[in-house]
From Swiss-Prot:
Its cofactor is Zn(2+). The keyword GTP-binding does not apply. This is Queuine tRNA-ribosyltransferase. Keywords: Glycosyltransferase, Metal-binding, Queuosine biosynthesis, Transferase, tRNA processing, Zinc. Residues 248-254 are annotated as: RNA binding. The gene is tgt. Pathway: tRNA modification; tRNA-queuosine biosynthesis. It catalyses: 7-aminomethyl-7-carbaguanine + guanosine(34) in tRNA = 7-aminomethyl-7-carbaguanosine(34) in tRNA + guanine. SUPFAM superfamilies: tRNA-guanine transglycosylase. It comes from Cereibacter sphaeroides (strain ATCC 17029 / ATH 2.4.9). Its EC number is 2.4.2.29. The keyword Nucleus does not apply.
């Protein structure tokens, strides 16, 4: 197994790419979807079951873990991999997005952000240096630079000022990260939906130099059309020989569109959160298992799916246990959703390698257009 971090492109089809990220903890096949293990767990899933869905890498959250159980405690207990029983790669975000969206009484300065915990009101400070320290204590394989995520809508001037602050923080993150063989630091492009700002941000990040590059500040309410508009040009501003990570995306059609535009990595809470709220993602779109139409339906969620929920349980059973608020409902629906997402990624990788992505995407949209199977 390699002792360093590397990325190899193995095939392209149009702007879409497939390849392999190599780390000391294993390979990550791209395009990759990363399930989110916010507080050291993918909710309702055992780590070995997450792996069984086909996931090569998980995402952990700096903000949540620094507050509870604390990064120092995780480090004393052997690091996040041992703590949560996941021996594959882990990517941790920098905490910036959660500070801006969850924390109370934020105070932003050139130095960093002071905020109060949304859990108990305790006061904390995050800076590029502290974020790098926390992620080092956690032991993550891929570390994200500390950035500011401006709330949208915002004026172009406000977005520009925020982006330039993030670029100064990116340089400080790079310096604080130091020399850590086998670990990678990703810079985060910002700039909202303005092409010139995105290009300026990418140029600043390339000058600093990172092992990978993220596209941040999207999937925050701007809509799919605006997001795809940015993705039509933003990946092209980044080095071809480094992974490109679109943060916080998303829905299956968002993922397919992002991959078509040259994105290599994505993460989102959607498949696990949807499972806990009775929503299943299938080849033919979304299924709301709460609906009464499923009450007497002996058929699986998706007859073509090989996950445990589809292999062994009916829609009627899933409807029943969800309505009865049984824990197994969250377990089975989350497993199904994560399995569906990983099957989608494998389909995209195979299609790109074969030069048949256009056919795959057409079939994907055709199946979704059919809608769910007819009620009995």
């Amino acid at each position: 197994m390699t002792q360093r971090f590397s990325f190899e492109l193995t095939a392209t089809d149009g702007r879409a790419r497939t390849g392999v990220i190599s780390t000391p903890r294993g390979e990550i096949r791209t395009p990759a979807f990363m399930p989110v293990g916010t507080a050291g767990t993918v909710k309702a899933m055992l780590p070995e079951n997450v792996r069984a869905t086909g996931a090569d890498i998980l995402l952990g959250n700096t903000y949540h873990l620094m507050l509870r159980p604390t990064a120092e405690r995780v480090a004393r207990l052997g690091g996040l991999h041992r703590f949560m029983n996941w021996d594959r790669p882990i990517l941790t975000d920098s905490g910036g997005f959660q500070v801006m969206s969850l924390a109370d009484l934020r105070k932003l300065s050139e130095e960093g952000v002071t905020f109060r915990s949304h859990i108990d009101g305790s006061k904390h400070h995050l800076s590029p240096e502290r974020s790098m320290e926390i992620q080092r204590l956690l032991g993550s394989d891929i570390v994200m630079a500390f950035d500011e995520c401006p709330a949208l809508p915002a004026t172009e001037e406000a977005v520009a000022q925020s982006m330039r602050l993030s670029m100064r923080w990116a340089r400080r993150s790079r310096e604080a990260f130091g020399d850590r063989p086998g670990h990678a630091l990703f810079g985060i492009m910002q700039g909202g939906v303005t092409r010139d700002l995105r290009e300026e941000s990418a140029a600043a990040l390339r000058e600093i130099g990172f092992e990978g590059y993220a596209i941040g500040g999207l999937a925050v309410g701007e809509g799919q059309e605006a997001m795809f508009g940015v993705l039509d040009y933003a990946p092209g501003f980044l080095p071809e020989d480094r992974p490109r990570y679109l943060m916080g995306v998303g829905k299956p059609d968002d993922i397919v569109g992002a991959v078509e535009r040259g994105v290599d990595m994505m993460d989102c809470v959607l498949p696990s959160r949807s499972g806990r709220t009775g929503q299943a993602w299938t080849r033919r779109g979304q299924v709301n298992i709460k609906n009464a139409r499923h009450m007497d339906d002996p058929r699986p969620l998706d007859e073509a799916c090989s996950c445990p929920a589809c292999r062994s349980y009916s829609r009627a059973y899933l409807h029943h246990v969800f309505r009865a608020q049984e824990i197994i409902a969250s377990m089975l629906l989350t497993w199904h959703n994560l399995h569906y997402y990983q099957e989608l990624m494998q389909g995209l990788r195979t299609a790109i390698a074969a030069g048949r992505l256009g056919e795959f995407v057409a079939a994907f949209h055709a199946a979704r257009a059919e809608g769910d199977i007819e009620p009995l």
